[in-house]
């Protein structure tokens, strides 16, 4: 079996396992993750926070985004611009979002695009199905974040 086939099977198994989590367990885990992120010095001192907007059972990033906005942080979230790339756009509220490619909430066209890859004092929050002990991630298979991370200069 090829590596790509193994990844595909692992993605399927992880998505099924994630669906089995009960709402109360998910809420507790989401709150803990949000609290942990907000306590990180890199997050507290970053000029720009680059989170993903959660969907379909992912770790809920909306409370994290809300707290960052309340703290006066610059928050920019991704928008898919074609079949393989994304750009980050500044948002001020969740009203700045609309359904985009793949049915995921993305910034409206009116939101300012920033050079997120070149933003050295920034923190990128990356979606994943899992990470291994060495920090390697398994995403959803489209490669958007893999391509972005290659040129990213922040944390």
Q: What are these model-predicted stretches?
A:
Residues 2-120:
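N-terminal active-site beta-alpha-beta segment that forms phosphate/nucleotide-binding
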Residues 107-111, 127, 151:
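Mid-sequence acidic-hydrophobic segments that form the walls
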Residues 128, 134-155:
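Membrane-associated lipid acylation/remodeling enzymes share a hydrophobic transmembrane-juxtamembrane segment
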Residues 113, 118-121, 126-138:
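Well-ordered alpha/beta subsegment
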């Amino acid at each position: 079996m090829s590596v790509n086939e193994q990844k595909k099977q692992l993605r399927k198994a992880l998505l099924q396992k994630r669906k089995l989590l009960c709402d109360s367990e998910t809420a507790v885990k989401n709150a803990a993750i949000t609290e942990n992120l907000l306590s990180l010095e890199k997050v507290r001192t970053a000029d720009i926070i680059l989170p993903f907007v959660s969907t379909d059972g992912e770790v809920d990033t909306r409370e994290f985004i809300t707290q960052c906005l309340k703290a006066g942080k610059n928050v920019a979230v991704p928008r898919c611009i074609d079949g393989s790339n994304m750009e980050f756009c500044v948002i001020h509220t969740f009203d700045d979002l609309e359904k985009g490619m793949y049915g995921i909430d993305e910034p409206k066209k009116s939101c300012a695009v920033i050079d997120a890859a070149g933003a050295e004092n920034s923190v990128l929050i990356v979606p994943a199905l899992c990470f291994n002990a060495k920090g390697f991630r398994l995403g959803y298979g489209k490669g958007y974040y893999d391509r972005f991370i290659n040129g990213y200069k922040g944390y």
